[in-house]
Amino acid sequence: MKSLDDLDFDNRFARLGGAFSTEVLPDPIAEPRLVVASPAALALLDLPAETSDEALFAELFGGHKLWSEAEPRAMVYSGHQFGSYNPRLGDGRGLLLGEVINQAGEHWDLHLKGAGQTPYSRMGDGRAVLRSSIREFLASEALPALGIPSSRALCVIGSSTPVWREKKESAATLLRLAPSHVRFGHFEYFYYTRQHDQLKQLAAFVLEHHFADCNAAERPYAAMFRQVVERNAELIARWQAYGFCHGVMNTDNMSILGITFDYGPYAFLDDFDANHICNHSDDAGRYSFSNQVPIAHWNLAALAQALTPLVEVDELRASLDLFLPLYQAHYLDLMRRRLGLGVAAENDQALVQELLQRMQGSAVDYSLFFRRLGEETPERALASLRDDFVDREAFDRWAEAYRRRVEEEGGDQESRRRRMHAVNPLYVLRNYLAQQAIEAAEQGDYTEVRLLHQVLSRPFEEQPGMERFTRRPPDWGRHLEISCSS
């Protein structure tokens, strides 16, 4: 095991030079204290799960202390925000502290969010608030537990530093981990500023360190873009299958690695609503739940445009054309598994779409429906679920088709139950649960956020005494729209 103050650094991105980032030191927050830490994320750096030295966490990630090998830098990038190009964004409140190598030889970026002002702060104060930091921490660790690729969160540090958003709040920092923090917007920045040499330098860097298998291809950059398309098709399929709504799918929030990145006003669906908008700033619903698939394709097309100096347009288009069929294949496979079906059949897509149509407008909890469906035999489970649907006759027709499908596939009920429980979570990160943990933390009580994190790290297992985390939201917690302010 390593110790927190003795990590091995290899700052590859910093070596790209000043065109890609600016050296900035963290601005310390006052009276830093550890709010919550993730044992699973600590393990990625070969660190012990126990956070016995909370003072060291607070010093390092509150900006008061820095490793001698760290090279904190603010990265420059641009991006399309709600469909409009913003020519200069960059890390306005976050710093890439450096890259740490673990014992397996993996590189992990250490990125401190809320580290203070940078040249890219755009009139902002460079701070993150406790509320948004806790939300990002919880999601960064909850999604991987569901099998959804994501950046990770090591810890949240609270403080007494005041910041003003809609109201006075307290500043916090979040230490984010990812194999890379390169975004679609990095490529867009160098493309639209016509810095094509730097664009190629960035592409070569990403190719070498994150898509090395593409080097053997006849046209490596074309092969790399195809893999980016493939990864994003699978990522979005997982979002849709598990009812995750990102909320701000700007191109600067899209990771080149195809992982969930830059959490803001996200939500998991409570009642199923294909048109759910979780971001209260998204008046037009550009980033609604149902729009995530076409928006991901749109964002990939924006990245493709930025790569035109390196890849032939026909090759980029051919890869883009793969996105939808790849997405559909991944999504149908996941939904088939959530329904307890192990073998593909011709009418599976219709079976899934009919179920979602029946759910729309009904008081059906999206996550608990699948969990309850696997609890008992199909006949008994379907009978107990029937009352949640508005059009019960239509549900009965779907239920009969599903029952026949299960019967045709065969197998015993216990095996079916185990399969379904392995892919259908009992615990999901509902906004009302996060809000309750945040409100307690804002009063200095971190018990709830730590307990919620612990429960969400094992979403498929029944955890005695944790039944309250399975409950549907109260009236005040249904369909919450979250602010972008953070």
UniProtKB/Swiss-Prot annotation:
InterPro entries: SelO. Mg(2+) binds at residues 253, 262. Its EC number is 2.7.7.-, 2.7.7.108. This is Protein nucleotidyltransferase YdiU. PANTHER family: PROTEIN ADENYLYLTRANSFERASE SELO, MITOCHONDRIAL. The active site is at 252 (proton acceptor). Belongs to the SELO family. HAMAP family: YdiU_SelO. Its cofactor is Mg(2+); Mn(2+). It catalyses: L-seryl-[protein] + ATP = 3-O-(5'-adenylyl)-L-seryl-[protein] + diphosphate; L-threonyl-[protein] + ATP = 3-O-(5'-adenylyl)-L-threonyl-[protein] + diphosphate; L-tyrosyl-[protein] + ATP = O-(5'-adenylyl)-L-tyrosyl-[protein] + diphosphate; L-histidyl-[protein] + UTP = N(tele)-(5'-uridylyl)-L-histidyl-[protein] + diphosphate. It holds the Pfam family SelO. It comes from Pseudomonas aeruginosa (strain LESB58). Keywords: ATP-binding, Magnesium, Manganese, Metal-binding, Nucleotide-binding, Nucleotidyltransferase, Transferase. Disulfide bonds: none annotated. Nucleotidyltransferase involved in the post-translational modification of proteins. It can catalyze the addition of adenosine monophosphate (AMP) or uridine monophosphate (UMP) to a protein, resulting in modifications known as AMPylation and UMPylation.
